[in-house]
From Swiss-Prot:
Keywords for this protein: Disulfide bond, Ion channel impairing toxin, Knottin, Secreted, Signal, Toxin
Tissues showing expression: Expressed by the venom gland.
Protein family (similarity comment): Belongs to the neurotoxin 03 (Tx2) family. 02 subfamily. HNTX-XV sub-subfamily.
Keyword match Lipid biosynthesis: no
Entry comment, domain topic: The presence of a 'disulfide through disulfide knot' structurally defines this protein as a knottin.
Keyword presence, Signal: yes
Disulphide bond pairs: C58-C72, C65-C78, C69-C115, C71-C91
Signal peptide coordinates: 1-20
Protein name per the record: Hainantoxin-XV-2
Functional summary from the UniProt entry: Putative ion channel inhibitor.
A single GO molecular function term of this UniProt record: toxin activity
Disordered: annotated segments: 20-55
Length: 117
């Protein structure tokens, strides 16, 4: 039982170290892509829907929203949540490396529980 716990704990440490370096690379790539997208957006004309001094901006994660298209990021969706009996819609990141790492940790914890039995 102790051996099983030690093996899984060492796996978690390896995944945490690997994911942090992968996340740093991913953030750097996203930041670079954002710069390129911003420059290319400046070259195009504004949409017909945007009038006057109004400009479109995206809603950050965990802020209220109405539609998926309002949220920032490719894997971010406008998802409904229930808070104190009221339904609210929040922008949430539903994909990416973090979700995969958390899923791996959840599977590892379930393996530890099965080792104890």
């Amino acid at each position: 039982m102790k051996l099983c716990a030690v093996i899984i704990a060492s796996l978690l440490v390896c995944v945490a170290v690997a994911s942090s370096s992968d996340n740093q690379k991913e953030f750097a790539q996203e930041k670079e892509m954002t710069r390129e997208e911003t420059q290319s957006l400046g070259e195009h004309e504004k949409d017909d829907e945007v009038t006057g001094s109004e400009e479109r901006s995206c809603i950050e994660e965990w802020k209220t929203c109405e539609n998926d298209c309002e949220c920032c990021g490719m894997s971010t969706l406008c998802a409904a949540s229930w808070v104190d009996g009221h339904q609210i819609k929040l922008c949430r990141n539903v994909g990416g490396k973090l979700k995969k790492v958390l899923h791996f940790i959840q599977k590892s914890v379930s393996k530890i529980k099965s080792c104890k039995k």
